[in-house]
């Protein structure tokens, strides 16, 4: 099923006799109405049948002008009746920017959230935790309302810095996996090439120290030699996997969901390799006290979502619910 021709209409009110007329904001205030606009779409359904492994497409069916919901209209916005004309019962000094729900004027309060698509390194002070430092990133595509995905790279907390392993936590996985196996699943099979993604490549003492720290992580991923073996290894730790699911489906799931939802803001595996190396580089520099840790409470690591992103996210959630019901 495809959704086409999305249209947002003007606010209308329907009387008891069936007559509809354009609603003004003041009318919605006086009559305790909600100042809403209808969302109308066309549904295009296509049926496919499988004939001995050959997919055959049957005729398409288009259902036009389907009402799927309503959305609050902000006063003086593009879809508001005051956008074109100022009615006599409206104040000319009212700049709008609010909605009217059941006759009451409502505003949407901006919400604070952590920044997306920027890696941050924090120290884990919990004594029971086996990882001392974590590089965390919350990713989402730009101008997209899909659910943010969290990925982390962690280092164990042994006293000797050269006896620690690096592990990665990915979306849809129930357990961390070795760092170098992730690199190999993304297409980088040579250990030297992987190290070059991580270090500064300036021949400094810091590069030498980072390579020594990576030594155990290199050994941990040495049993995996091909990209397929790396993906097969990751498929063993899929969330909610059942014993009835075939290995082929698990491998397909890793390719289409696990690796795709890792660093979702990046377009391809090559850019993910570079960015993963950057995350490891930052984690190890914080671990070695070369650069400071990030401050969770600093406003440079936060963003404020105003009404546009908040309404967009809510609309996306409601639309997903509709598609699942269909």
PLM segments and residue spans:
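N-terminal non-catalytic structural scaffold regions of very large proteins
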Residues: 1-326
């Amino acid at each position: 099923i495809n959704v086409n021709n999305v249209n947002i209409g003007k606010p209308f009110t329907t009387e008891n006799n069936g007559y509809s007329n354009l609603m003004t904001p003041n009318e919605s205030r006086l009559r305790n109405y909600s100042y809403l606009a209808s969302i109308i779409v066309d549904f295009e359904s296509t049926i496919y049948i499988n004939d001995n492994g050959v997919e055959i497409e049957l005729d398409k069916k288009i259902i036009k002008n389907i009402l799927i919901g309503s959305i609050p209209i902000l006063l003086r916005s593009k879809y508001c009746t005051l956008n074109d004309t100022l009615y006599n019962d409206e104040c000319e000094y009212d700049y709008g920017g609010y909605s009217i729900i059941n006759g009451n004027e409502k505003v949407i309060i901006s919400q604070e959230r952590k920044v997306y698509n920027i890696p941050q390194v924090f120290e884990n002070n919990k004594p029971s935790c086996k990882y001392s430092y974590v590089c965390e990133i919350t990713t989402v595509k730009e101008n997209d309302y899909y659910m943010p995905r969290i990925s982390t790279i962690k280092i164990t907390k042994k006293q000797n810095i050269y006896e620690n392993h690096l592990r990665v936590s990915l979306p849809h996985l129930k357990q961390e996996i070795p760092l170098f196996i992730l690199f190999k699943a993304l297409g980088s099979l040579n250990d030297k090439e992987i190290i070059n993604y991580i270090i500064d490549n300036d021949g400094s003492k810091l590069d030498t120290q980072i390579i020594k720290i990576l030594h155990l992580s290199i050994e941990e991923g040495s049993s995996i030699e091909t990209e397929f073996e790396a993906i097969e290894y990751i498929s063993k730790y899929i969330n909610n996997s059942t014993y009835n699911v075939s290995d082929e489906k698990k491998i397909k799931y890793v390719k289409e969901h696990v690796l795709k939802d890792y660093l979702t803001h990046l377009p391809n595996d090559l850019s993910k390799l570079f960015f993963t190396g950057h995350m490891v580089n930052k984690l190890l520099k914080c671990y070695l006290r070369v650069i400071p840790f990030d401050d969770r409470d600093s406003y440079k690591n936060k963003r404020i979502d105003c009404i546009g992103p908040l309404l967009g996210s809510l609309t996306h959630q409601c639309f997903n619910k509709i598609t699942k019901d269909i």
